């Protein structure tokens, strides 16, 4: 195989690996798999900016918040990433953007949240594995509902920014 063809195949393999990385992270969040979620991020310093949820410089800080806030049976979450745009910069660096549609049913306080936005990510290949080294979530729209008997009350609808 020519060097050019080898490099093209490697680029496609890298794109596919990153296109599997983000859903691995989101599925781990939905299933409350803390170790799997943690493994998708760079082990040492990484930049995580989830806006109002928090900013973190290390994956352990995100794990702490995730464990305290989201890892409960009453938090029924569903993350759906779509429309990925992945750019392989070089052999070990890549960037990407994803659209996100998120739903949360909180059975403890009878609330429902839907959120749309986008992730802007940077990835690093370490020991032949892609990990998230930087991520930012930018919210576009949110619908927050309160369940009151058989009625839904709109708490907020619009742009969270």
Please provide the spans of the model-predicted regions.
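Intrinsic disorder/low-complexity signal
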Residues: 12-13, 18, 29, 48, ...
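Short, low-complexity N-terminal intrinsically disordered segments enriched in polar/charged residues
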Residues: 1-27, 31, 35-39
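Short linear sequence motifs
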Residues: 18-19, 34, 59, 112, ...
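Solvent-exposed, flexible loop/coil residues
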Residues: 16, 52, 60, 142, ...
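A beta-strand edge to alpha-helix "cap/lid" segment located at domain peripheries
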Residues: 2-6, 71-161
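A structural signal for alpha-helical segments
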Residues: 13, 54-57, 111
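A solvent-exposed, acidic/Ser-Thr-rich amphipathic alpha-helical stretch
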Residues: 34-100
């Amino acid at each position: 195989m020519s060097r050019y063809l080898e490099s093209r195949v490697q680029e496609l393999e890298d794109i596919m690996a990153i296109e599997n990385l983000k859903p691995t992270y989101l599925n781990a969040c939905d299933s409350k798999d803390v170790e799997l979620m943690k493994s998708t991020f760079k082990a040492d310093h990484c930049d995580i900016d989830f806006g109002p949820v928090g900013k973190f410089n290390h994956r352990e800080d995100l794990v702490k918040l995730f464990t305290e806030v989201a890892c409960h049976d009453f938090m029924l979450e569903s993350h759906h990433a779509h429309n990925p745009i992945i750019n392989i910069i070089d052999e070990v660096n890549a960037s990407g953007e994803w659209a996100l549609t998120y739903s949360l049913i909180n059975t403890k306080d009878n609330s429902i949240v839907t959120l749309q936005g986008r992730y802007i990510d940077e990835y690093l290949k370490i020991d032949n594995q892609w990990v998230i080294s930087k991520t930012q979530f930018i919210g576009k729209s949110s619908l927050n509902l309160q369940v009151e008997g058989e009625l839904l009350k709109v708490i907020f609808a619009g742009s969270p920014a």
